[in-house]
Amino acid sequence: MNRLPSSASALACSAHALNLIEKRTLDHEEMKALNREVIDYFKEHVNPGFLEYRKSVTAGGDYGAVEWQAGSLNTLVDTQGQEFIDCLGGFGIFNVGHRNPVVVSAVQNQLAKQPLHSQELLDPLRAMLAKTLAALTPGKLKYSFFSNSGTESVEAALKLAKAYQSPRGKFTFIATSGAFHGKSLGSLSATAKSTFRKPFMPLLPGFRHVPFGNIEAMRTALSECKKTGDDVAAVILEPIQGEGGVILPPQGYLTAVRKLCDEFGALMILDEVQTGMGRTGKMFACEHENVQPDILCLAKALGGGVMPVGATIATEEVFSVLFDNPFLHTTTFGGNPLACAAALATINVLLEQNLPAQAEQKGDMLLDGFLQLAREYPDLVQDARGKGMLMAIEFVDNEIGYNFASEMFRQRVLVAGTLNNSKTIRIEPPLTLTIEQCEQVLKATRKALAALRVSVEET
């Protein structure tokens, strides 16, 4: 039987939510009630699968962990009042920490003036953010298109490459095995995990995948495409594969890919949605090899953990295909004043506090600790790797990885697996993590591994 709409029910639910938003604290009964409501609403109206996923990585199989607020720059507090060191970082959005006061203030100040733009008049913050990114990004990158997410920034990059290369008779895209570029139809065509791809086949034609980090495979693919008339429009890749398991290519790989793109007349699209904004110890990961892409994709941390912001930055030569008709690719909310205020404040914080350098220093400290633990627990840990504050611990099997996340939850440290490699647990904290908190994370990791060893030996 069809359910009839209920304005009264919707009004009551929204009023209840607004009341919660106004509250700073909850008493015990309110916390219990909120937990029950959230679990029920996720089950009935969001997706029950999220509950089972959360159950698999929380202590005691309890999926009732409901976050309530940021505790500090680097911590989260749940409705039970438990504080967790955030080593997940919202999959890389909290580079400048949770509720960074500079970012929050910029957004609040802009909110007091104008939350969204008219769509007709020229909006100043979009212009200022584009100018700032032109100054910040490497090489000849100059023009920016703004969106709301990483997958949107990749979609814009693919369409831009198509618009530029189609008149040249080039329609093929080369991506890499293990890649993750998003889940909308175009970006999913570049993503490499069958779990995400198969339900939506056929995807966009013209995409090929080669092994990541294998420059000879890349050369062969470009050469074979040229021989068959399937000339390559662009190569798209991540400087470090994030969801693939924090996979670092051999030194010099990006440089070699750049040379191949130049040789075959293909554009180089770098997806720095996860590696950008200081995460790896440089503002952009491509700067470790001084590589300059034709198109750069940003999102996640660009909004400072306060607003969703995506950006696709390109050279003038490439971007100029949109000059005659700037409406060829647009989005209603991309580049809105609140998002641009957040992005400008985020860049300011990253530069003022030199957070990329801090990411390098604290990342080295953490990785040294993880490598030492990997040597001590070879029966559990297969590898520890990373660059800056983008790290991973890979376990010998999936179950140990899940159990490790659960044990870390007991230690009040939040971690999770990578989407394309479930054996691998990512360590991706805010760049503002303190030295003391780094030490706490290493202690928690040691305790979690010790508990896992006992558990494995008992089975």
Swiss-Prot record:
Belongs to the class-III pyridoxal-phosphate-dependent aminotransferase family. Putrescine aminotransferase subfamily. Keywords: Aminotransferase, Pyridoxal phosphate, Transferase. The modification N6-(pyridoxal phosphate)lysine is found at residue 300. The gene is patA. It is an enzyme of class 2 (transferase). One of its GO terms (biological process) is putrescine catabolic process. Pyridoxal 5'-phosphate binds at residues 150-151, 274, 332. Its EC number is 2.6.1.82, 2.6.1.29. GO terms for molecular function: diamine transaminase activity; identical protein binding; putrescine--2-oxoglutarate transaminase activity; pyridoxal phosphate binding. This is Putrescine aminotransferase. NCBIfam families: PRK11522.1, putres_am_tran. Gene3D superfamilies: Aspartate Aminotransferase, domain 1, Type I PLP-dependent aspartate aminotransferase-like (Major domain). Transmembrane segments: none annotated. Pathway: Amine and polyamine degradation; putrescine degradation; 4-aminobutanal from putrescine (transaminase route): step 1/1. It catalyses: an alkane-alpha,omega-diamine + 2-oxoglutarate = an omega-aminoaldehyde + L-glutamate; putrescine + 2-oxoglutarate = 1-pyrroline + L-glutamate + H2O; cadaverine + 2-oxoglutarate = 5-aminopentanal + L-glutamate. PANTHER family: AMINOTRANSFERASE CLASS III (PTHR11986), PUTRESCINE AMINOTRANSFERASE (PTHR11986:SF112). Its cofactor is pyridoxal 5'-phosphate. Pfam families: Aminotran_3.
